[in-house]
Each structure stands twice: as C-alpha cells, then as structure tokens.
C-alpha cells in the first residue's frame, strides 16, 4: 500500500510540476543522502519533552539534511521505523502543514495535510509545483523512554519548505553542448554546510553526469571511467580556504581517456565554469593521472583560458541591435537607424526576424495578407548585407530561431516544427521536420513562439499562453526531436504572448497581464516579475541578452537594462519609437 501511495503522489506531482514558488537566487546542490559530512548546526534534534505535533514538525525540518541516509531525521524515529523507512528517490517540498491527531496515553495517530511547492530529485534537481498533498497514509508516534518517537511513517521524504530554503543552495553544473562551442547549464540544489566541501561535491556531480532529461542533449567530458583521486583542495594541496582569496582549487583525477586537445579544453571548461559560478575562485590546477591536464596550464587555469565557452557571453554581440521598422530590417548605429544593405533592408512586409548567433546571417519571415483568409508567409535566409533565399513557406510562420550549427528553426502553421538548412551537397535550402510528438501529446495546441536556448540544447515555446520547455535531442539517424516537455512558471497562468532567452538559464516573457506585462522564469520553473513602470500594453515581440531586455509596445521599442537599475523603469530606444517596430537580436 505504501508503494502504491508513493506512486500516486509521484503521478500527482508529475501533473502539477512547474508551479510558482520563491527559491533562493544564490545557491548550492548533492545526490540526496550519499555524502558523509557534518550535520548542519541549524537542524533540530528530538528532546524528551517534545509534544508529538512539535516533534513531527521538527522531523520535517531535519529531513532537509540528506547526509548519511537522512541520519538527522532518523533520530526522530524508533529503531524499527528507521529500519523500515525507505528514503530513496525524490523529496516533496511541502508547506502549510496541518496535522490531525488521534491520541491515547501511549500512542498518537496522525494524518498530514500540506501544500506541495516542488520536488527535489535524488540528484538535486528542483522543480516547482502546486497543489494539495494527497494523503500519504497514517503516521504513528509512540512514547519511549526518550520521549515521543515516530514509529510508523510513509516511505519517501517530505521536506519542510522553509528548512529547504535555509539548508539547500542553488549551483549550476556545466556540460558541453553537442557542437563543442559552449557549455550548458544544469542547475542543482545541494546541502553542503562546510564550504570547503562544496568544490568536491560539485565536481563529483559533474562526474555523475547530467540530469536524466539532458543525457542525450549534452556531452560530458568527465564521464566514467574518469574519477576523482581525492577531495578537491587548494591549489597548493591545503584542505581549507579552497577557492577563497588566492588559494585557488586543485582537482586531481585519474583514468583519463580523452586525448585530443579540444576535448581536454572542454573538460577543463566544465570544471572551471562550474566552480567559478559557485564563487570558488581560481587558479584551477587540473591534473589527470598524476600529470597536468595540459602542460601549458600546469600552474593553473583561469576563466580567461576557457573564455570561448563562457556561458554568460551574449551571442553575436558585435552585431548589435537590429529592428524591423515599417516591415524592413534596420540597424542601430550610434543611436541612428539605417536600413541594412542587401535584401533584408529592401524586402517589405517582414514580420519577424533573427540574426544568427555568429552575427553574420539573418532569417526573416515575410507575411502577405496578414490577418486575411489567404494569408501567406515565407522564410528568407541569407547573409546580413547580402541576398536572401526562400527556405520555407506556409499559411503562418513563427519567429525564427538560430541553432549553433546555423540551422533556422521555425514553426509552420502553428504545429509543424522545421529546421531550415543549406544542403551541403547542392547548396540549396532544405527543410527537415523536427519530431515534436512528445510536445503535442502532452501539450496539445498551437505553438505561437519557439526559441532555442543560446546553447541550442533546449527549446522554449508558448503553447496556450504557457511556457513549455523541451530538450533538443539529435537522434542516431541525425534527425532532431523535442523531448521531455514540461511546463515552466505556473504562476504566469496562461498569459504569455512571446518569449526570449536572456541567458541559458533564464527566459523573459511578455504577457497579457497589464499589471505584470513582462516576467522572468528560470529552468527550475520559478517566475518573477520585471518592473512595469513606463510600459504601455499590449506588448508583442521581445528580445533579450544578458544585459538588456527589449520589448515592442504600441509606441515602439523600449529597453530595460540591468546596468541602469538606479533609474528603474523602461526607456525609449531612440530611432525605434515607431508603432509596429520590433527588436531583433542574435538568436
């Protein structure tokens, strides 16, 4: 029965994942219950005078520490209950807990009610959720010589939300994208109270591999048989102050099978960006089988040595801001607007466009008879400043999005996802369908927007006003498929109009919600609202990079930049305050 109840809860959770919850923005992650380490000092312990209700609440807080198979939480159990309790698998994060008791002198039976706010997998993957906790089954407490103890409880882990926020922190692992051009974020939550153990924990997670849904979308240069020889230390071998000051970090591994220089560079990039983003500072001494990973970096690597893979760099930054004004593509030059040379500066009726991630090409949608029964759309692709070739057509086309391999992704007639490429043999345009069966079966409806992440391994879509995220997987036959779709940002409701990736971990959306017309949502599913001062609705298109968000409103294009937060609100983009103008960035 307990196994059936756990299955029921997991099925229920699968239906409600991607809800809205507030999660720490600075954070660190660990496979639950696998690491031997000191118990955090803020965790409660049972005491003889605890009332059953208090003891249960303190038990839920103690489950926040996964170390040694939840040893801290097991102190609240009788020996028989501890032996029977299966704490493996995902934890449910719960809040607003209510206990309903049936009491006798020596025994208390309890049923638990609570709100589900999310789940935490056994590898530290957090996803938001919303809904009521199904009845997990009875909880029984008995009086012992040491006070009340839990003698029966459901299998699985129920984790107190507030204690989760205090104990777990968010960090990001990085894996290589399939092209080897950049690294891909994989956010994790870990509970590490000793800062000097964090580097070892994060590298161990890299060695264990990406979250399951990313297994076929990224490469892991730290895959087995590679393993750590021992804990990560300071660069000089010291065991304290790792990654602080000028101490750096030293990673010693063994059983390295990677030989080519580019793969070794990617391996180093995975380690360096994972540690650097966790504020574990270099230099990073990386050794394999008793020798430096690269002789030229024997004294240590820095982030500059792997800058080409920097996950925070804006794609095609040199290309700058472009826009569609009166149906043609223009470029911004020192706050002056000039039509781009070539086809894209001449063609009328352009309704959506994107510059390639290299900044050298353009994909643009031309729509004739917009809104009419005979509306027709066509996709044109070519060099920025050059001529264009028609690459796809249909009754309607979504805003195009570029992948790292210079393919253009577009949705034809709201439900057919295509990759438009230049055929290597003939040089002619080729249209290759993308398998979107998994998306259509779980989230049926029109795909109104589709944008690829900067690393090309994820696709964010707007379906029915909701943000849907899917993995981009290349099959053995060389085809592409959208896999593992899930909803992000339940708190956004069904108000989303368009979206853009701000970073590899952060999406910004426009909404029909007049009070919150622009919002953010991250890969965990956590959403938050952007400032709305200075915005007029409705907003249509949106384009973003790590530093700036641009939106198309009734009066033209406006911008919000993190660098000018001392002056909150949105600012006009000079030259683009034209009704119908839409921002265009690489991506």
From Swiss-Prot:
SMART domains: Germane (SM00909). Its main location: membrane. It is found in: Cell membrane; Secreted, Cell wall. A lipid is attached at residue 20 (N-palmitoyl cysteine). It is a lipid-anchor. Keywords: Cell membrane, Cell wall, Lipoprotein, Membrane, Palmitate, Secreted, Signal. A lipid is attached at residue 20 (S-diacylglycerol cysteine). Residues 1-19 form the signal peptide. SUPFAM superfamilies: Tricorn protease N-terminal domain (SSF69304). It comes from the Bacteria. GO terms for cellular component: extracellular region; peptidoglycan-based cell wall; plasma membrane. InterPro entries: GerMN, Lipoprotein_LpqB, Lipoprotein_LpqB_C. May modulate activity of the MtrAB system in controlling homeostasis of the cell wall and cell division. Partially restores antibiotic resistance to M.smegmatis in which this gene has been disrupted. Belongs to the LpqB lipoprotein family. Interacts with MtrB, probably extracytoplasmically. This is Lipoprotein LpqB. It comes from Mycobacterium tuberculosis (strain ATCC 25618 / H37Rv).
């Amino acid at each position: 029965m307990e196994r059936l109840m756990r299955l029921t809860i997991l099925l229920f959770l699968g239906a409600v994942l991607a809800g809205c919850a507030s999660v720490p923005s600075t954070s660190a992650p660990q496979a639950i219950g696998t690491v031997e380490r000191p118990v955090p000092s803020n965790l409660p312990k049972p005491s003889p005078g605890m009332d059953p209700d208090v003891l249960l609440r303190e038990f839920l807080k103690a489950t926040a520490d996964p170390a040694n198979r939840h040893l801290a939480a097991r102190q609240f159990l009788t020996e028989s209950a501890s032996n029977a309790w299966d704490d493996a698998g995902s934890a449910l994060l719960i809040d607003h807990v209510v206990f309903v008791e049936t009491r006798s002198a020596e025994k208390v039976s309890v049923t638990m009610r609570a709100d589900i706010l999310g789940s935490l997998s056994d590898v530290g993957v957090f996803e938001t959720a919303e809904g009521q906790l199904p009845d997990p089954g009875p909880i029984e407490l008995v009086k012992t010589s040491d006070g009340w103890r839990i003698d029966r409880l459901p299998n699985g882990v129920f984790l107190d939300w507030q204690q989760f926020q205090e104990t777990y922190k968010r960090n990001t692992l990085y894996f290589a994208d399939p092209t080897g051009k950049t690294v891909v974020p994989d956010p994790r939550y870990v509970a590490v109270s000793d800062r000097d153990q964090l580097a070892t924990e994060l590298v161990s997670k890299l060695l264990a591999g990406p979250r399951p849904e990313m297994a076929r979308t990224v490469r892991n240069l730290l895959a087995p048989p590679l393993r750590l020889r021992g804990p990560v230390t300071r660069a000089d071998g010291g065991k304290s102050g790792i990654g602080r000051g000028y101490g750096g970090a030293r990673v010693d591994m063994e059983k390295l099978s990677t030989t080519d220089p580019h793969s070794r560079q990617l391996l180093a990039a995975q380690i360096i960006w994972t540690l650097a983003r966790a504020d574990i500072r270099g230099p990073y001494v990386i050794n394999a089988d008793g020798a430096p990973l690269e002789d030229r970096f024997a004294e240590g690597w820095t982030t500059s040595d792997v800058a080409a893979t920097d996950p925070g760099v804006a794609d095609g930054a040199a290309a700058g801001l472009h826009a569609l004004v009166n149906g043609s593509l223009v470029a911004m030059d020192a706050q002056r607007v000039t039509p781009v040379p070539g086809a894209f500066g001449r063609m009328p009726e352009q309704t959506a466009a994107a510059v390639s991630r290299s900044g050298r090409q353009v994909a643009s949608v031309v729509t004739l008879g917009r809104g009419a029964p005979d509306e027709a759309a066509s996709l044109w692709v070519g060099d920025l400043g050059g001529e264009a070739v028609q690459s796809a057509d249909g009754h309607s086309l979504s805003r195009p999005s570029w992948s790292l391999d210079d393919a253009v992704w577009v949705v034809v007639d709201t439900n057919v996802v295509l990759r438009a490429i230049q055929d290597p043999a003939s040089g002619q345009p080729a249209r290759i369908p993308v398998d979107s069966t998994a998306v259509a079966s779980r989230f049926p409806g029109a795909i109104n927007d589709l944008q690829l992440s900067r690393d090309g391994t994820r696709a964010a879509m707007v379906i029915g006003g909701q943000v849907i995220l899917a993995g981009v997987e290349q099959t053995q036959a060389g085809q592409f498929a959208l896999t593992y779709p899930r909803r992000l940002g339940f708190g956004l409701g069904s108000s989303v109009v368009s979206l853009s990736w701000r970073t590899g971990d952060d999406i910004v959306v426009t909404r029909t919600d007049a009070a919150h017309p622009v919002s953010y949502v991250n890969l965990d599913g956590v959403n938050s609202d952007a400032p709305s001062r200075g915005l007029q609705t409705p907003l249509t298109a949106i384009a973003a990079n790590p530093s700036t968000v641009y939106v198309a409103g009734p009066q033209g294009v406006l911008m919000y930049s993190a660098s000018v937060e001392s002056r909150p609100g949105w600012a006009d983009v000079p030259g683009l305050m034209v009704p119908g103008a839409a921002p265009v960035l690489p991506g």
